[in-house]
Amino acid sequence: MTITLQQLIALSPLLIVGLTVVVVMLCIAWRRNHFVNATMTVIGLNIALLSLYFVGQVGPTDVTPLLRVDGFSMFYTGLVLLASLATSTFAYPWLQGYPDNRDEFYLLVLIAALGGILLSSANHLASLFIGIELLSLPLFGLVGYAFRLKRSLEASIKYMLLSAAASSFLLFGMALIYAESGDMSFASLGKSLSDHQIHEPLLLAGLGMMIVGLGFKLSLVPFQLWTPDVYQGAPAPVSTFLATAGKIAVFGAVMRLFLYAPVADSESVRIVLSIIAFASIMFGNVMAVSQTNIKRLLGYSSIAHLGYLLVALIAVQSHQLALETVGVYLVGYLFSSLGAFGVVSLMSSPYRGPDADSLFSYRGLFWHKPILSAVMTVMMLSLAGIPMTLGFFGKFYVLAVGVNAELWWLTGAVVLGSAIGLYYYLRVMVSLFLNAPQVLQRDTPNNWALTAGGVVVLISSIVVLFFGLYPQPLISLVQLVQPMM
């Protein structure tokens, strides 16, 4: 098997991030310097983002049976790289006050990004599994990075044990599917499924187990119990990564699997997925209503958002629109989450023990940091799906797909869930404009808008507003990124 230059260029984002991992590792071994390592990380991720332009020039290619690089994988790779960049940027000021080793943080983020890029191009069950593991393993370390805090350590252990259990389900499911169909690439799975083998008990059992494993990674009900605890325990920059890159990469891979292998055509699988979507939307929104901790609230809301996305996934076989929906929704979700978690990270930096994550810390933020609270307001509006923000178009598309595919139950659930969601997002927004407490527990420095993290947060809010008012460029982009069939 010789690899041509074309294939090397197609793999360039993966190779560049891998090279950055090695460089950062050598830098840490040679001399610890927080600034140097952070800069190396950001430069590496930026070069990887720029290399996507050259990947686009090459056109769709298959690199070994495991990876397929096309517009679809480039889109998801770009989203993962943006999320990793934002995470590194938020982490720098947070780590400034951190008493232990700081540099390994960037190393772990880079390795997780590597897993995300691999998942975006996965075309085979083996690369799907390797990608998920590469993404999950560094996250155990990242979630427990503030290990002197009991909560962070607890979150890390919870996540590790549950993740291991979920991975074993996933692997066993893959083994059963392989036993039945004799091949592990997505396309040949599609062939064996289209020959009406889907009623074979082994295939159904394998699919069921894979749904358990993937449902855990996407924190869908009933595999969601870790989500709020881990989001709350993890440092704010890590919660950013978990909520964005961790979900988007896995969803991209699952999306491709469903496109090539018409899994949702089977009545039983579709019913199971519909129940999961319905439960996720309802549970996520209802549980978020009573939260007083902003990271837990965003954790529950991410369960609901993945429920909305699952509606589009169920309809993916029958409708071209579903691909577009997922693209638009994920971009909106990415920037809204980056902004919301970014504000939490800015408030929590530098490290001073627990994060500023109680809603009380944000009370009256408007009176001394008006722009920061405006950013937070925009993010909450976008997550709630209010018109003139990007989140609205995502919701609108999901409803359109649901109606087109005649998923009436789920469309009703999306509407109801959005209504409940409005209540708790408004709660966060209202608390920003109440009277400020006399003694400020946590606050950002006055020049926050000039720091790198502040710039990321401001750019996110501008993107959300710009595409909310004028979504055409984004829609055209998403229509271009169709997977190679």
Curated annotation (Swiss-Prot):
Q: State a single Gene Ontology molecular function.
A: NADH dehydrogenase (ubiquinone) activity
Record's protein name = NADH-quinone oxidoreductase subunit N
Q: How does it assemble?
A: NDH-1 is composed of 13 different subunits. Subunits NuoA, H, J, K, L, M, N constitute the membrane sector of the complex.
Q: What is one process in the GO biological process aspect for this record? A: ATP synthesis coupled electron transport
Asked if the Swiss-Prot or TrEMBL record annotates the protein with the keyword Protein biosynthesis, the reply is no
Reactions mediated catalytically: a quinone + NADH + 5 H(+)(in) = a quinol + NAD(+) + 4 H(+)(out)
| Signal sequence, start to end | none
Q: Under which EC number(s) is this enzyme classified?
A: 7.1.1.-
User: Which UniProt keywords are present, listed alphabetically?
Assistant: Cell inner membrane, Cell membrane, Membrane, NAD, Quinone, Translocase, Transmembrane, Transmembrane helix, Transport, Ubiquinone
Question: Where in or outside the cell is it found?
Answer: Cell inner membrane
What Pfam families does this protein's entry cite? Proton_antipo_M
UniProt membrane topology term? Multi-pass membrane protein
Say where the protein is mainly found: membrane
Q: Which InterPro entries does this one have?
A: NADH-Q_OxRdtase_suN/2, ND/Mrp_TM
Domain of life of the organism in this record? Bacteria
- Cite a GO CC annotation: plasma membrane
Record keyword Translocase present = yes
Q: What does this protein do?
A: NDH-1 shuttles electrons from NADH, via FMN and iron-sulfur (Fe-S) centers, to quinones in the respiratory chain. The immediate electron acceptor for the enzyme in this species is believed to be ubiquinone. Couples the redox reaction to proton translocation (for every two electrons transferred, four hydrogen ions are translocated across the cytoplasmic membrane), and thus conserves the redox energy in a proton gradient.
